[in-house]
From Swiss-Prot:
<comment type="subunit">
    <text>Component of the cytochrome c oxidase (complex IV, CIV), a multisubunit enzyme composed of 14 subunits. The complex is composed of a catalytic core of 3 subunits MT-CO1, MT-CO2 and MT-CO3, encoded in the mitochondrial DNA, and 11 supernumerary subunits COX4I, COX5A, COX5B, COX6A, COX6B, COX6C, COX7A, COX7B, COX7C, COX8 and NDUFA4, which are encoded in the nuclear genome.</text>
</comment>
<keyword id="KW-0999">Mitochondrion inner membrane</keyword>
<protein>
    <recommendedName>
        <fullName>Cytochrome c oxidase subunit 6B</fullName>
    </recommendedName>
</protein>
<dbReference type="GO" id="GO:0005743">
    <property type="term" value="C:mitochondrial inner membrane"/>
</dbReference>
<comment type="function">
    <text>Component of the cytochrome c oxidase, the last enzyme in the mitochondrial electron transport chain which drives oxidative phosphorylation. The respiratory chain contains 3 multisubunit complexes succinate dehydrogenase (complex II, CII), ubiquinol-cytochrome c oxidoreductase (cytochrome b-c1 complex, complex III, CIII) and cytochrome c oxidase (complex IV, CIV), that cooperate to transfer electrons derived from NADH and succinate to molecular oxygen, creating an electrochemical gradient over the inner membrane that drives transmembrane transport and the ATP synthase.</text>
</comment>
<dbReference type="InterPro" id="IPR036549">
    <property type="entry name" value="CX6/COA6-like_sf"/>
</dbReference>
<keyword id="KW-0496">Mitochondrion</keyword>
<comment type="similarity">
    <text>Belongs to the cytochrome c oxidase subunit 6B family.</text>
</comment>
<keyword id="KW-0472">Membrane</keyword>
<dbReference type="GO" id="GO:0006119">
    <property type="term" value="P:oxidative phosphorylation"/>
</dbReference>
<comment type="pathway">
    <text>Energy metabolism; oxidative phosphorylation.</text>
</comment>
Amino acid sequence: KALYAPFDATFPNQNQTRNKAVDTAPCEWYRRVY
């Protein structure tokens, strides 16, 4: 899951919580991470 790569490394348990927030705009979030 590249979408949660940054969170998976630091917050593997919070990756699920962020997933819901990213669900609203996965495309925009993906561009912000990279």
